[in-house]
A protein has these predicted regions:
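Key DNA-contact positions within bacterial/archaeal DNA-binding proteins
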Residues: 59
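Hydrophobic alpha-helical connector segments
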Residues: 74, 85-116, 166-170
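Amphipathic alpha-helical packing segments from all-alpha helical-bundle domains
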Residues: 81-85, 129-155, 164-168, 192, ...
Length: 208
């Protein structure tokens, strides 16, 4: 084994180790930020508090993120990804494409009962990062809705139509309804009412 080969291997290992450390620190910062954003809210959470919770320096925070807004975006993105899992699972359990779509919408509203998600996604996001950024980061959820509408139309369960307008209409309705639930004095009652009303809208679109 030549010294050049050993040096190349050592450099590769060093790069991988550095990448792993970077990923670990980034993940720790996002975890800490999520905890504090959910508990204290975006406005009341400082980067110094996030650094202390993650057991790193404030300089380390700025090494990985430009500022609090970008850190919130990372937390928000993770919440959207986490939220998508039960939605996809609920969708996949139904054979009928429109029943699957309705199950996915129900799962979305069920997930919105989580108090941490409510604080981060429903209550603070618009103030923290703005409407356009929220919609951009929620793009995967909208794309899932468009696909579900397209599949239901192809199966003859709803009338043929361009999927994008209806997806935006229904997603907007789900988000507004979820915010009503999040602000309700009795969230369980509000959630049941939301499920009922969304169900009526979706049933009205179905072709028997």
């Amino acid at each position: 084994m030549t010294s050049g080969y050993r040096q190349a291997v050592a450099m590769k290992v060093a790069r991988r180790t550095q990448a792993e450390r970077t990923e670990a620190t980034t993940s720790a910062l996002v975890d800490a930020a999520r905890e504090l954003f959910a508990r204290d809210g975006y406005a009341a959470t400082s980067l110094a508090a996030v650094a202390a919770r993650a057991d790193v320096t404030k300089g380390a925070v700025y090494h990985h993120f430009e500022g609090k807004q970008q850190l919130f975006e990372a937390v928000f993105t993770r919440e959207v990804e986490r939220m998508a899992v039960p939605v996809v699972e609920a969708y996949s359990r139904k054979k009928d494409p429109w029943d699957a779509f309705k199950a996915g919408c129900r799962a979305f509203l069920d997930e919105c009962l989580d108090p941490d998600l409510q604080r981060i996604v429903l209550l603070d996001a618009l103030t923290a990062i703005g409407w356009e950024e929220v919609r951009r980061l929620e793009g995967p959820l909208l794309e899932m809705m468009e696909l579900g509408i397209l599949q239901a139309a192809e199966a003859g369960r709803i009338a043929p139509r361009p999927p994008e307008p209806l997806a935006h209409f229904l997603y907007g309705a789900l988000c507004e309804t979820a915010m009503i639930v999040a602000r309700a004095d009795d969230q369980k009652v509000a959630h049941r009412q939301a499920i009922t009303e969304i169900g009526r809208i979706l049933d009205g679109l179905a072709i028997d």
